[in-house]
Amino acid sequence: MEKEKFSFKSVDGNTAAAIGSYKFTEVAAIFPITPSSPMAEHVDEYASQGMKNAFGDVVKVAEMQSEAGASGAVHGALQGGSLATTYTASQGLLLMIPNIYKWVGEELPAVLHVAARALASRSLSIFGDQADIYACRQTGACMICSHSVQEIADLAPLAHLVAIKASTPVIHFFDGFRTSHEIQNVEFINDEFWKNLLDKDAVANFKKRALNPHGHAVTRGGAENDDICFQGREAQNLHEEKIVDVACEYFQKVSEATGRPYAPFVYFGDPNATKVIIAMGSVTETAIEVVTDLMKKGEKVGLIKVHLYRPFSVKHLMATIPASVKKIAVLDRTKEPGSDGEPLYLDVVAALRQGGREDIEVLGGRYGISSRDTQPKHIKSVFDFLDASKTWTGFTVGIDDDVTHLSIPVDENYAIAHSYTSCLFYGLGSDGTVSANKSSIKIIGDETHQYAQAYFAYDSRKSGGVTRSHLRFGKQPIHSTYYVENADFVSCSLDSYI
């Protein structure tokens, strides 16, 4: 695709999702919840400015009384023939689950954009992991994962195209804070490309299915008895089977346009790798750095990124795993008490059994819960652990577990050399440090023709807490989705911090 068909802008993940989703949304039902709130705010702002979607209309935005109300409004809009979208996270997503089941059964093209966040259990955490996403895996909704801000820009509109053509609800998710609030300079595909990909016949068929007593009367959402309900549910297998094909079709078209690889599962690493990590979310960007570094040192390692989590395609996973692989570590960003393994790990184990690769040793581990930082040394330690004399599933990485002793040893001396410049700013909540750094990194990214990245860490307090601004910029793409540890420049706003 010619370069003039792209535009470049420094944005965070939430902004990229809002821009992408607005194109194919007719009704947006919203309710704020951290860290997804900016998506809804941006869509509301675009609508108030009179911005047109791909259909030439201004999006109708309705703020509801809760996330349950937002999902109900989406359901009603879809039944009435409007393409509807919502944005949420954490407990808000849980409140939507009853309606998600209905959207799936009624084959409605709802789209949820989720900045994945921890669920409140022993304590409340507003920070990111994927517990909320995994709670939806049994609903039957299609689930698409973006691993970076750039991928959000590419896959947010793709999620809508899949929903429309496959007549299925789609949950498009990415890591809360680490990706939703990270700023990167992003390449946006221009609107004409997306309009050309839209299946207009599918849109027309969806409109025809709208509940309308005047000429298109149908019965929907009735009650069935035991003599027929089972058969009807199984008959939907034919519909569900086409979702993977539709997703693959759009993955391929976006890959061809951008040069960025998209598929249900994407492999990165040595073609003859013996050790592979499987994960989804921002940690895969860090893993790319580690795999690249270890390959230079002669190690045969690889990474599999999960883009299509549901439906989970055994066929595509088997085709992605190199024949040489002997050991796999599956990393889950959640903890599911009482289970014999975390969700992605169990999916991979079952897939390997179905695919005839029971020769592969598989270990499952947890990382990054509640936005716990995952550094390159942690990924390196996972590869090392696969070769350890004593291994176990259920390991943790990134913490020192001195209670249940499930954490694995970490090589504290491991580090990756980078050519970019890194900066670390310590500030006081509401003192303007974060806002100034957001402006600075956008100027660098938009005006200096350099790659730029910014991430901001702070506690749950609205003001008065410690803030840390992690800035990086350089001549090469930046995949460092972790805190700056060895900064070239450090700023401190308060003497007391020193």
Give short role names for the model-derived ranges:
Residues 1-135, 140, 157, 376, ...:
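Thiamine diphosphate
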Residues 10-16, 251-275, 288, 406-420:
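Glycine-/acidic-rich phosphate or pyrophosphate-binding loops and their flanking alpha/beta elements
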Residues 26-63, 271-272, 276-307, 419-486, ...:
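Anionic-ligand anchoring segments at beta-strand to alpha-helix junctions in alpha/beta enzyme folds, i.e.
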Residues 55-59, 170-266:
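Conformationally flexible catalytic loops at phosphate/diphosphate-handling active centers
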Residues 65-67, 122-141, 317-336, 456-494:
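A structural-propensity feature for long, helix-poor, extended segments
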Residues 126-176, 200, 350, 354-368:
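Conserved thiamine diphosphate
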Residues 173-214, 319-356, 363:
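Terminal amphipathic helices with adjacent charged low-complexity linkers/tails
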Residues 327-416:
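Peripheral docking tails and interdomain loops at the edges
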